[in-house]
Amino acid sequence: MLSNKAIRPAAGATDEKLLEWLGISGTPKKVLSEVTYFTCLKMLSETLAKMPIKFYQQTDKGVERAEPNAAYELLKTRPNSQMTPSVFWGAVENNRNHCGNAYVWIRRQFNRKKYGGEMVIKDLWIMPSADTTIVIDDKGVFGAAGDIYYWYTDKYSGESYVFPSADVMHFKTSLSFDGLSGAPVRDILAATIQGEIGRAHV
């Protein structure tokens, strides 16, 4: 039987022997918690980015594999001119976990035909979470009253854009306090730990 003495048994990210093996023993706990946090973010984003994309539809016979369409081809091959699917989904997952929300602008274009034409999806662009705000149009300024819009400000050009919800894919974490936006994973973990510490002292 072959064995490899360099292989360590399973250990957590804060295991002292593991940290020593990685050459980061003696590091302050606050720094270690940051290292652990971002290591977990990296693992989550890379795992999601590697997952295959499958396209389904609801039919009278139940859920079945659907025929590929333009959106599916973009997600599978190249969401936009700057990103591969793995880079795209990795960035989406990082924004979702770290900021609580990830936003993707669905850019469309009008394809003119001999008689009329049609709107098609051209590409998909990630809007950094820190630069995007959810807006509920109570007064009907942008359209029908009560509709949801996404206000995005380009930090490089300084220009702002307002997109209807139909043109934005919004991914949020599993915990939401208003039903519209997700809470950052860091805040969820902090609240959980503080709750456990509080119960331990009761």
Each predicted region: which residue ranges?
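Structured, contiguous alpha/beta core segments that scaffold functional sites
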Residues: M1-H201
